[in-house]
Amino acid sequence: MKAVRERVLAVVDDDTRVLESLEDLLESAGHTVHLFRSAQALLADEAFGRIDCVISDIGMPAIDGFELERLARAARPGLPVILITDRLELIKGRQTTARDESRTFLLKPFSERELLGAINKALAARQRP
């Protein structure tokens, strides 16, 4: 039987409460979680090369979630990025196309099931040839 590798997730948000809440949820689901208060912190961290999926707030100072997605994909093509926000207007017209399954949007508040489902879908899409 093939062993399942533990997934390494990065959560990026400037709100400490969101970071802590998502850390608890994702660790309880069996993932290794790295927390970052800014996009710059993630991109500069040595763990960036081992991240399997990024979960990032869109509305952050300096580098927002869209720019983080662009920079992360430039460094690591195909890296799944899940963008979260409580502002629907930020994601209107930017929904995922059939060609780009590595981009996912979640509107806050989202359920545990929605987030874990989005992570599983993003990781499965990345593993397809």
Language-model region placement:
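Acidic catalytic/metal-coordinating carboxylates
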Residues: 37-38, 64-68
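C-terminal output helix
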Residues: 110-122, 127
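As written
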Residues: 65, 95-106
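Two-component/phosphorelay signaling modules centered on CheY-like receiver
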Residues: 16-34, 100
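Conserved phosphotransfer cores of two-component systems
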Residues: 45-49, 71-79, 100
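Receiver (REC) domain active-site loop signature in two-component systems and cognate sites
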Residues: 60
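Acidic, metal-coordinating helix/loop segments flanking the phosphotransfer/catalytic sites
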Residues: 35-53
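Active-site residues of response regulator receiver
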Residues: 57, 85
